[in-house]
Amino acid sequence: MKVIYQTCCGVDVHKSFLVATIVKTTGGIEPSYQKKRFSTFNNSILEFKQWLLDNDCHDVCMESTGKYWVPVFNLLEDEINVVIANPKWVKAVKGNKDDTKDSKWIGDLFRLGLVKGSYIPCKIVRILREYTRYRYKLVSCRSSEKNRYQNALTVCNIALDSVVSDIFGKSSTSIIDYLLEQSGTSINHEEIASKILKRLKSKENAVIESVEGYQMTDSQKYRMRLVRAHMDYITAEINDVDKMIETLISSNIDFENAVQLLCTIPGVKRDSAITIISEIGTDMTHFSNSKRLCCWAGLTPGCNETGGKKKSVRITRAGVYLKPALVQCAHAAVKSDKSPYYKKKYESLVKRRGKKRAIIAIARMILTAIYQMLSTGEQWNPSDLYKIDIPAPLVEKQKAKAIKQAKNLLQREGILPPDEPLAS
């Protein structure tokens, strides 16, 4: 095999230490090895960096072990080319295995160019990514608390969620506050009616019936107050994170331009655009083409075939944060009547492939468009958009023409009898 890196280093990273092996190819067939162990404290990592520079080693490869690779990467990235590899691509043969042999194995694979590097964006994108991912977790946590709150109402024989559309709306919140303050199980109908806003006045009797005879103990009241306080706290945290994200976006002209560009796509709003930018960045040169980006995002079918038998070809589990954002945009895009491009595509796909596959296909179309837009700087304007915006009379004319052509083909093949000539 051809040697790609004459001098490189393989690193096996752990929580408290790392083992590094420098691999040098000096002209012979067998390379030479230098091995050393360092602590993961900052001073020791800087010593490791200096050791690499002293040995004229500017290419390092290590596997992405948890978050342990991040401190090492942060201190090396300014002067050294660091490649982070998925552990499945650098896995050593089981059996004769230890930390030193692992680092040597990683170095040998990297030296021959057999290691696929993971996409690590620049520092400002990584900072934005930390905020958007934390916001995603906060929203998920708040959703869990909302479910607990609704379950508590069900346990207390309160069926308010069967009447109102939003159990956390103003009317519902006022009614639940009133119930939490009561000492018994009886309610004042006039008091309940006074807390119902105009939009809900038509359902006044149903609202009163839904809370009549509720059973709420002191322990359940205490638990509901805790859950609500936690929801309010999480909401405040989300607002703070949103402010920080907006500050980062507004302070970087490339981010702001990219967000404005992505917002021209049907179904993509500002929050979704920011999430997408935080995951893939604005520089598309890291991906050779749009197919590689879609594969990295987990939106392409798998390839698992052996002996002429095809096994599971489901999409991969990649894109844990990016894929949900794109699927959310796809759901919004296929419901848009103002820009029906993806809606028409979806309606065509769903007949043949089903709803789930059709949504994933639309999400991939959106990501492909994003790749082209960020690469060229052009706004969303697909080349086949004219096919979607055809006037209705022209569509009917094309349908009639297609039916006529199909009929002529069937007649030539003898499947249909020829038309009888008109009587003169």
Q: Where in this protein do the model-derived segments appear?
A:
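A detector of single, family-specific signature residues
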Residues: 1-424
